[in-house]
């Protein structure tokens, strides 16, 4: 009788127990992360060949308590290693756990290694070699409090490495976890299974292996037990023979076309097809390149199956907000075409799962590497989505139709289509080339959350459909009242910059990492005005943000450009914007400083100044706070000192209810003319944005 331990992913213990019982295992003891059990040699080999859920299977050699480090050595030395290992085979010791005796796992591993080699040396005057990378045998030691477990890894490589997956996408899900997802999904054999975002096809391949009675270990050639002296080659060969026979029978019983995978990336589909061939399942699984938005049910109405998916959940790049549209569409397409089917979705993001707009009937908590994930199973009911009020769709179509007649639209790649036009849809919708940014204003607490959420999901879906934007190119942002410093804090770290065209100018935007994108499109005609006024001028861009105005001045053949902002992030962004327009030279300088202090200290004079000051600022880098309504006259006095006699200031602001008092401006010997209507652009007619042209009297 062999005493064994099968390890598994967190949350898979119950599935593993059921599997081992079916294989004939005895005296099972479930612990966190695995199961202890007993079995004859046939059970040992069957569990290695047939376990879909186990990560590894170990032979338990000995367990003992220790009072000091010498106890660890002595107890290990007393094991008859010469009856377990071959002298000529390499080995490696892995030690897990620490206590007040063994404070370092490497120290524990060395103690056990010394005991093993000393055992061999005592008998043969020779010792086996260590191999840290590809050992023939792995000895695993677990220390829990003062109890040590010593085991032999019979698996070799982890059991999830079935041998068929030679090609995979970024961050593929492990095969044994995929099997656990399939077995927990509610899918039944001989019913259709569709994965609409299949990646390298692991979920479908694992399901097809179950359906065709193909053993997960059938294609593996390397095993840890082959370097174990207790290995029974005859029993193993019989196990292998039976597994091959079962697959030969099982594949014939398998119904064709019951496993279908789709993915938007044709290259990924090619990888999945190669993996299926490696698994000898190419006759029962089909893969197609297809966007989620084109997903339809290929089966007859009476055939009920399961949709299964492990969609991206933003952990790798920390970008949940640009996956919202994907989850919305998955929910919508499921309800639209797969009534009465089951949907099973695996994700680490409860936030994103909420956008499926479905209630699960069963949940499973599983661990995917370091991530705690949830598998949620849903029953798909008749789609009620089309019955929602169409006022938003109609308004968006109307707005877009108007904009298409606008000549400027041919010259710009960023424009606004919707800006809170309807009271029930407090959204901003902006197009950036082939990307869509939708911003939702935080609803008041008096608004029913479910209604607001449903409206948002509807708006997101119809926005991308009406504007013909790919689902993967939709970014959602949530706006709430916040301090200015929060507005410019980094939210994510995708570093997803790309260039958009605005007239003759190239500008970098980043739709994901910050609340704002790096370009205020409502300033578009102000920037154009700056470009037309800047020829031969010394231009100053204060509170420069990402320096778009500086680029216009440079392309307008200004004499020099000074770009000033307190944020290093935006100074660097400004430099990149200037660089892609070939405007980096010694006359164009960038200064990271508090703008209010800098204009007092500078000795330079300017012909053209653009300033778009904040409503309020209280940065740690500033000595005093700034409030526009309170301090703008003082600001204008300081600007006057650095403005040349025939110079101009373009002053812009989006501050609510802010107006320059022309009489107060006159008192400081400046003349101000409101030019808001001159610089108002068709896609921002309602925007609370005002501009003035100011000069010396």
UniProtKB/Swiss-Prot annotation:
Homology family: Belongs to the methyltransferase superfamily. RlmKL family.
InterPro entries per UniProt: 23SrRNA_methyltr_KL, DNA_methylase_N6_adenine_CS, RlmKL-like_Mtase, RlmKL-like_Mtase_CS, RlmL_1st, SAM-dep_methyl-trfase, SAM-dependent_MTases_sf, THUMP_dom
EC top class named in words: transferase
Organism (species): Buchnera aphidicola subsp. Schizaphis graminum (strain Sg)
Listed Pfam families: Methyltrans_SAM, RlmL_1st, THUMP, UPF0020
Gene3D superfamilies named in the record: 3.30.2130.30, RNA methyltransferase domain (HRMD) like, Vaccinia Virus protein VP39
Record's protein name: Ribosomal RNA large subunit methyltransferase K/L
GO CC terms of this entry: cytoplasm
EC number: 2.1.1.173, 2.1.1.264
Subcellular location(s) per record: Cytoplasm
Highest classification ranks of the organism: Bacteria, Pseudomonadati, Pseudomonadota, Gammaproteobacteria, Enterobacterales
Role this protein plays: Specifically methylates the guanine in position 2445 (m2G2445) and the guanine in position 2069 (m7G2069) of 23S rRNA.
Main subcellular location: cytoplasm
Record field: catalytic activity: guanosine(2445) in 23S rRNA + S-adenosyl-L-methionine = N(2)-methylguanosine(2445) in 23S rRNA + S-adenosyl-L-homocysteine + H(+); guanosine(2069) in 23S rRNA + S-adenosyl-L-methionine = N(2)-methylguanosine(2069) in 23S rRNA + S-adenosyl-L-homocysteine + H(+)
Segments passing through the bilayer: none
Gene Ontology MF terms: 23S rRNA (guanine(2445)-N(2))-methyltransferase activity; RNA binding; rRNA (guanine-N7-)-methyltransferase activity
Domain annotation THUMP: ranges: 43-154
Coiled coil, from the record: none
UniProt entry tagged with the keyword S-adenosyl-L-methionine: yes
Keywords: Cytoplasm, Methyltransferase, RNA-binding, rRNA processing, S-adenosyl-L-methionine, Transferase
């Amino acid at each position: 009788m062999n005493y064994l331990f099968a390890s598994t992913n967190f949350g898979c213990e119950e599935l593993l127990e059921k599997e081992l019982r079916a294989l004939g295992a005895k005296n099972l003891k479930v612990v966190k992360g695995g199961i202890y059990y007993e079995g004859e040699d046939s059970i040992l080999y069957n569990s290695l060949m047939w376990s879909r859920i186990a990560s590894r299977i170990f032979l338990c050699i000995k367990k003992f308590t220790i009072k000091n480090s010498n106890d660890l050595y002595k107890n290990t030395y007393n094991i008859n290693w010469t009856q377990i290992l071959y002298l000529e085979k390499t080995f490696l010791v892995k030690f897990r756990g620490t206590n007040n005796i063994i404070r370092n796992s490497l120290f524990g591993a060395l103690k056990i290694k010394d005991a093993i080699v000393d055992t061999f040396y005592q008998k043969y005057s020779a010792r086996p070699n260590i191999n840290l990378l590809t050992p023939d045998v792995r000895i695993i030691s677990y220390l829990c409090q003062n109890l040590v477990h010593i085991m032999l890894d019979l698996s070799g490589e982890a059991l999830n490495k079935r041998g068929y997956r030679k090609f995979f996408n970024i961050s593929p899900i492990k095969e044994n976890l995929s099997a656990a997802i399939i077995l927990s999904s509610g899918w039944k054999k001989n019913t259709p299974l569709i994965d609409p975002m299949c990646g390298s096809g692991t979920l479908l391949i694992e399901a097809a292996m179950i359906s065709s009675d193909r053993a997960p270990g059938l294609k593996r050639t390397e095993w840890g037990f082959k370097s174990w002296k207790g290995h029974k080659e005859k029993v193993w060969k019989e196990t292998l023979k039976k597994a091959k026979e079962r697959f030969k029978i099982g594949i014939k019983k398998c119904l064709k076309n019951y496993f279908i995978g789709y993915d938007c990336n044709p290259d990924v589909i090619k990888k999945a097809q190669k993996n299926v061939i490696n698994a000898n399942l190419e006759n029962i699984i089909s893969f197609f390149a297809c966007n989620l938005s084109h997903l339809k049910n290929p089966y007859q109405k009476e055939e009920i199956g399961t949709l299964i998916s492990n969609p991206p959940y933003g952990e790798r790049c920390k970008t949940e907000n640009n996956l919202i549209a994907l989850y919305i569409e998955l929910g919508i397409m499921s309800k639209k075409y797969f009534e009465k089917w089951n949907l099973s979705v695996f994700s680490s993001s409860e936030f994103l799962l909420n956008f499926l707009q479905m209630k699960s009937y069963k949940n499973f908590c599983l661990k995917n590497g370091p991530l705690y994930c949830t598998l949620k199973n849903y029953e798909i009911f008749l789609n009620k989505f089309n019955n929602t009020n169409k006022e938003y769709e109609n308004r968006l179509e109307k707005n877009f139709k108007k904009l298409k007649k606008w000549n400027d639209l041919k010259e710009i790649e960023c424009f606004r289509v919707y800006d809170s036009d309807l009271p029930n849809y407090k959204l901003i919708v902006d197009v950036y080339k082939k990307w869509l940014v939708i911003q939702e204003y935080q609803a008041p607490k008096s608004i029913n959350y479910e209604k607001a959420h449903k409206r948002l999901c509807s708006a997101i879906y119809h926005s991308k459909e009406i504007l013909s934007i790919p689902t993967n190119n939709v970014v959602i942002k949530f706006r709430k009242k916040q301090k200015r410093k929060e507005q410019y804090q980094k939210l994510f770290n995708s570093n997803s910059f790309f260039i958009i065209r605005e007239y003759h100018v190239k500008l970098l935007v980043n739709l994901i990492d910050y609340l704002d994108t790096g370009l205020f499109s409502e300033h578009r005609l102000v920037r154009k005005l700056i470009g037309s006024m800047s020829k031969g001028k010394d231009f100053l861009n204060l509170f420069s943000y990402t320096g778009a105005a500086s680029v216009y001045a440079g392309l307008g053949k200004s004499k020099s450009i000074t770009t000033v902002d307190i944020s290093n992030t935006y100074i660097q962004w400004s430099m990149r914007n200037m660089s892609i327009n070939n405007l980096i030279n010694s006359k164009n300088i960038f200064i990271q400083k508090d703008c209010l202090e800098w204009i007092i200290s500078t000795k330079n004079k300017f012909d053209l100044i653009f300033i778009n000051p904040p409503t309020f600022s209280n940065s740690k880098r500033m000595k005093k706070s700034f409030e526009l309504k309170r301090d703008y006259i003082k600001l204008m006095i300081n600007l006057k000192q650095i403005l040349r006699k025939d110079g101009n200031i373009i002053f812009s602001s989006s501050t609510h209810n802010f107006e320059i008092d022309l009489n107060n401006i006159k008192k400081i010997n400046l003349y101000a003319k409101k030019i808001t209507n001159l610089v108002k652009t068709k896609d921002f007619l309602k925007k609370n944005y005002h501009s003035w042209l100011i000069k010396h009297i």
